[in-house]
């Protein structure tokens, strides 16, 4: 077999870590993946899977399981506080961009099944205490040496920080609660019941996402200092005041114990010695484009491909970053600036988003990562 192959230790059981583990396993590596929690499971949210993610999942052997019961909407819409349509774009038409939405748990379970199929050893309840560039990984109860360590344990990764890689985190001063609800008749108007819709009102916005015939994903976003809008239970009155047309929907929201801050993270380098860093640990972005998971999969598959082409690990890691960083970093910045548009007053924001929807330059940049075929595989379109 050409290229580098050996033993890899993967830190983190999210989308990036699982994708890297499977991709390496498919290319002849032995792989052990560590998840600090007692089980690998997703938080109660949905996820958008665009062309890039669908192609990656097909290669990883997880596509069919992921798509069971998935939702294929026809349009992405933006509406204002009065329910007026600001912008709309078609998806899932022949020759156009594809996007499906599923519960994140379904995706994670599909990836776990694929990891098992290629022989990845998954160790839960495994706390990694130290990673070094020479390829040593330490745990509460011992250590191991690896030809490659993949760090994919999230934006707050301690393993990454131990490597001394220069990190920059940009706060957006926005936070988000994510919930899943059963879909019920009459919750929303029939004209957009099956569409993907973002509603704006002041500096609050609400993302409406069907995930299946019977499951709905909502994301509620507001400024970090908007105390009247945050907390557990959700202050429903505050959100209904902003979105009165969504009152039947908001009234059904249950506990909201977790409010995540939106951030963008960049690194000077995605690797150090025998360690590769990917996913939110390397290139976190606000979810404005629904590309956090997609970019993690692009990075993971690109890493495995570069390793398969080069006998030298240092050369392979350098080639990997050169190949993947441009499109991912452009996507990060586009997502960052799109999130910042939420700070605009309603009228200027509506005018901006309406004009952007008619701009081919805007559409091309918005869709850059979504339409990127993962390195090393054939386009599925």
UniProtKB/Swiss-Prot annotation:
The keyword Oxidoreductase applies. Its EC number is 1.14.13.182. It holds the Pfam family FAD_binding_3. Signal peptide: none annotated. The keyword rRNA processing does not apply. It catalyses: 2-heptyl-4(1H)-quinolone + NADH + O2 + H(+) = 2-heptyl-3-hydroxy-4(1H)-quinolone + NAD(+) + H2O. Induction: Up-regulated by PQS. GO terms for molecular function: 2-heptyl-3-hydroxy-4(1H)-quinolone synthase activity; FAD binding. This is Putative 2-heptyl-3-hydroxy-4(1H)-quinolone synthase AqdB1. The lineage of its organism: Bacteria, Bacillati, Actinomycetota, Actinomycetes, Mycobacteriales. The gene is aqdB1.
